[in-house]
């Protein structure tokens, strides 16, 4: 069978196994040749390890100098007679294969990170493979809903909406390469609460509490979670909306976790990352034109970073091997420093003032945006022969 990219709006319905393998190998090659992580963690738990920042962090810590062993938790779908499965499934498979080639432990736990059974599996894996303790916990779950405790079948569901105003902005239909104007109504307080429950810090704190109670926290253990703030032009839909409320809750959680981990001479940080094309970010209306302009400017200025560049720089220059960890006035680790540089933002704003439905593919980096989206699912790599037939039985044997 031949696997073609199937896109519906901004959702990819297919994944190419060997394109995902190419993506893993490309990221490994980058971190091996980048400035290396020194004094890094050796036993790392990643919650949300199969794509985006979670996967990039796992690759950076394993191959970028720290030589870490990892346990990765993710909720992915394997191949079947009905479909190819998810990209994250293959990312898990090929990451593990490459890590084990270099003698590293790479445990994949495929399950619901909100479920108590998954936590039990994680604790058992830490006991079995990590001598009972972890040195770093990365919280990188990206999901639209979370089960409500003690209410089977009921969920909190996040929404992407502004507050106190309607916001009109553009998103892209990647299937047909179209600009779509979207108007978002103001969120209700209940919608805000649900979004905080799904995307705020409560589950992160619950995981750390579970690990503390299981005596799985090593001396000096740190934990990080990822956030976004963005420039003022993105604030109506992001920082001042439901997503922003959830991220502020995440930031506050980092402070309470920092106090808890102080008992282990450890620390907790919310890490503010750069705006990037991820499976999650393409769903945010009004952010897409900004991404097109930002990609164009940062590539022109030769300071563009993807997830893997961000994570290698985070661990090599911010979190490890330093006399002290550099944070801002709110105790946030800022990986959006290059993005928010005034000369970058001035040029981005100039492009956005001119961008519309007729010229977005010309003045913005639409091809870069779309290709990065395709590469999340294993497509768009020159070294992969996409005309080659793939035997279903072969990929059914690929297990993480």
Curated annotation (Swiss-Prot):
EC number of this enzyme: 1.3.1.9
InterPro entries for the chain: Eno_Rdtase_FAD-bd_dom, Enoyl-CoA_Rdtase_cat_dom, FabV-like_NADH_b, NAD(P)-bd_dom_sf, Trans-2-enoyl-CoA_reductase
Single Gene Ontology BP annotation: fatty acid biosynthetic process
Residues flagged as site, Plays an important role in discriminating NADH against NADPH: 76
Molecular function GO labels: enoyl-[acyl-carrier-protein] reductase (NADH) activity; NAD binding; trans-2-enoyl-CoA reductase (NADH) activity
Catalysed reactions listed for this entry: a 2,3-saturated acyl-[ACP] + NAD(+) = a (2E)-enoyl-[ACP] + NADH + H(+)
Chain sites annotated for binding substrate: 228
Pathway participation: Lipid metabolism; fatty acid biosynthesis
Binding-site list for NAD(+): 48-53, 75-76, 112-113, 141-142, 247, 276-278
Record-annotated membrane-spanning stretches: none
Pfam families for the chain: Eno-Rase_FAD_bd (PF07055), Eno-Rase_NADH_b (PF12242), Enoyl_reductase (PF12241)
Enzyme class: oxidoreductase
Quaternary context: Monomer.
PANTHER family with a match to the protein in the record: ENOYL-[ACYL-CARRIER-PROTEIN] REDUCTASE [NADH]
Role, per record: Involved in the final reduction of the elongation cycle of fatty acid synthesis (FAS II). Catalyzes the reduction of a carbon-carbon double bond in an enoyl moiety that is covalently linked to an acyl carrier protein (ACP).
NCBIfam families named in the record: EnoyACPredFabV, PRK13656.1
Family listed: Belongs to the TER reductase family.
Protein name: Enoyl-[acyl-carrier-protein] reductase [NADH] 2
Natural source organism: Vibrio vulnificus (strain CMCP6)
Encoding gene (name): fabV2
